[in-house]
Amino acid sequence: MTFAKRLLAGFAAILMATTAWADDHAAPEALPMALWSTYEIPAGAKPSELEVSLKEYLKGEEKRGFNNCAMYKHEFGSPRAFYTTCTFDDIDHFARIMDGSPSVASPDEVQLFGSHMDHIVLMTKQGMTKMPKYVLYASTAFSPHLNHVEMQAKAEEFYSAYDEGFGECNRYEHAWGPELAFYATCGFESYADFAAGVNKVMKIFEGRLATANLNILNHRDDILVKVMD
């Protein structure tokens, strides 16, 4: 299956999920999409300068029409970077924002960050009720021989352990950008909370997932700390 077909299959699966309700049931509320951006802290730079610049940038993005912008910073994992997120209702909302006004950043502005990445993702499950102090950010890509529906099923099987361990997790999948992957973000307020969550997750990994055929191609876990919400 080509990239384009997988992308269309993902949108189709979400559309079917929202329309396959009987007439006597209310359809579930549509979940937002999100723009995730990563701004690497270059060697020798002052993270505080980049942080101030990005805070002003995000305030401007909310004025442009994005919803609920927030920023987190690297704590454990890679790369050493700031991670920003802004939500929007759907791709048409995104188009109105992008066509309606220019970005706050000036084309002549000095670039304070190193490498940079933008990624549009679809939220598929919302478990967080607030922006937590810390976020466990998990990214998983599955074997390319799977079709998109099979990848979604594997992601559900794998990330269910995160849901059970940490309780408050959001789920996302790729919509547009640099990688075809599935994501979980789980919140916690202290490293004691993190340890408690990990202990629960590891029991699941050592139990029902120990022999599960998950077809994982690559995986990473990062810990991020809140800078702005």
Ranges and model annotations:
Residues A9-A17:
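Bacterial N-terminal signal peptides
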